[in-house]
């Protein structure tokens, strides 16, 4: 990412990026499947003035390590371990903002080690199917999707500029991340472990904002969420990539939550 003030380095094996003053409250950004830590440019523009932002390339993505062959059946364990390792390196607990796959592991990290997390923003987090092996249809869909970037991503860039409301640099960084995906992970590693879902939300002990499309098939059933710490917002006219699809609506609900959760945040 070329945003001003970006520092890029490897921490605990993962490729890490940061923006903003380290004295500000920290937000950790966890991306979705096939994206990278560089795919947040619009959010960075909006938040870097008031927060210290940290993003990583999740294992198997971007410039972070590939999975070893004997790790592919346990990718979900590595993603959680990597997330906890990252959070444990920070001087104070951050708000963790996660989309899709990143949202799932932000959720699991907060459930496992709540003392490491100040709050959560979960953008249509991935619902784990609980299956012991990858879904062949889901694998084939992702492989075909990544194959469509064989021309360097120009066709997909043009399509998204014509069809979406995404910011131009969001499209560019999204497309640039696809050739960097670990294809062995896509073919053999797409299992997410335990399929428990709504009970994980009900067990959270940190302030949490869930933002999802009104018709999301992955979001928890609102009627089954009884935890008063979990705020749920469902938005019309957006898909799985809520933030990119309607940045104004996303930030209208997320930014006040961040301000409230980080009010009085200790200096780093």
Enumerate the language-model features and the residues they cover.
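Catalytic histidine-centered segment of alpha/beta-hydrolase-like enzymes
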Residues: 238-251
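Active-site loop/oxyanion-hole signature of alpha/beta-hydrolase fold enzymes
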Residues: 12, 45, 54-97, 252
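Conserved HGGG/HGGXW glycine-rich cap/lid loop of the alpha/beta-hydrolase fold
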Residues: 15-68
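Flexible "cap/lid" loop of the alpha/beta hydrolase fold
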Residues: 107, 111, 117-149
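Conserved alpha/beta-hydrolase catalytic His-Asp/Glu region
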Residues: 131-133, 148-202
């Amino acid at each position: 990412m070329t945003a001003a003030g970006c520092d890029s380095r490897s921490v605990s094996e993962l490729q890490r990026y940061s923006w903003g003053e380290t004295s500000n409250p920290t937000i950790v950004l966890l991306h979705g499947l096939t994206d990278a830590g560089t795919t947040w440019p619009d959010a960075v523009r909006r938040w870097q003035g008031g927060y210290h932002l940290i993003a990583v390339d999740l294992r198997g993505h971007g410039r972070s390590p590939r999975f070893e062959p004997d790790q592919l059946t346990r990718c979900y364990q590595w993603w959680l371990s990597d997330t906890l390792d990252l959070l444990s390196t920070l001087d104070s607990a951050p708000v963790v903002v996660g989309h899709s796959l990143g949202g799932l592991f932000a959720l699991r990290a907060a459930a496992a080690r709540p003392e490491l997390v100040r709050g959560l923003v979960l953008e249509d987090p991935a619902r784990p199917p609980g299956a012991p092996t990858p879904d062949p249809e889901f694998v084939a869909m992702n492989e075909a999707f990544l194959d469509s970037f064989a021309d360097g991503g120009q066709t997909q860039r043009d399509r998204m500029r014509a069809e979406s409301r995404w910011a131009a640099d969001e499209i560019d960084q999204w497309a640039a991340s696809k050739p960097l995906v670990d294809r062995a992970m896509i073919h053999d590693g797409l299992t997410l472990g335990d399929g428990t879902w709504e009970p994980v939300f009900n067990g959270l002990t940190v302030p949490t904002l869930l933002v999802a499309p009104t018709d999301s098939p992955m979001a928890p059933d609102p009627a089954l969420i009884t935890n008063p710490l979990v705020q749920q917002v469902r938005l019309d006219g957006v898909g799985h990539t809520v933030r990119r699809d309607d940045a104004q609506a996303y930030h209208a609900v997320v930014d006040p939550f961040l301000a409230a959760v980080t009010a009085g945040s200790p200096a780093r």
